[in-house]
Amino acid sequence: MRYCRCQRATAEEPTMDKPAELNKLRWRSRRGMRELDHLFDRYLSHCWAQASEAERGVFLRFLDCEDDKLWRWLMGYEVCQDASFAALIVTMRALPA
């Protein structure tokens, strides 16, 4: 069962799947809030390698948001008005635990 559209099977190698680069991204996504850290880690594990450049750009912009906003959006307490962020939030929340 696929949980996000970015898990599509492709014959191409992802452009950024080198362990060092992925580790830097994991470090950048750390928030010190267990819920957020878990959601970001699941996205990076399940979707990042196959994500398009546009999807990656949205994720990188998403990381620049304030932690309290990220938490409210991802926990469903507040609706994000940015359509690209809203799509990412749906994807992240649908990933398996």
Curated annotation (Swiss-Prot):
Its localization reads: Cytoplasm
Q: Which InterPro entries match?
A: SDH (IPR005631), SDH_sf (IPR036714), SdhE_FAD_assembly_factor (IPR050531)
Q: Which UniProt keywords apply?
A: Chaperone, Cytoplasm
- For whether the record's keyword set contains Cytoplasm, the answer is yes
According to its UniProt entry, one GO biological process term is:
succinate metabolic process
Q: Which superkingdom is the protein from?
A: Bacteria
Fetch the SUPFAM superfamilies from UniProt. YgfY-like (SSF109910)
Cytoplasm keyword on record = yes
* Predominant localisation class: cytoplasm
Cellular component per GO?
Answer: cytoplasm
Tell me the function of this protein. An FAD assembly protein, which accelerates covalent attachment of the cofactor into other proteins. Plays an essential role in the assembly of succinate dehydrogenase (SDH, respiratory complex II), an enzyme complex that is a component of both the tricarboxylic acid cycle and the electron transport chain, and which couples the oxidation of succinate to fumarate with the reduction of ubiquinone (coenzyme Q) to ubiquinol. Required for flavinylation (covalent attachment of FAD) of the flavoprotein subunit SdhA of SDH and other flavinylated proteins as well.
| UniProt similarity note | Belongs to the SdhE FAD assembly factor family.
Recorded protein name is FAD assembly factor SdhE
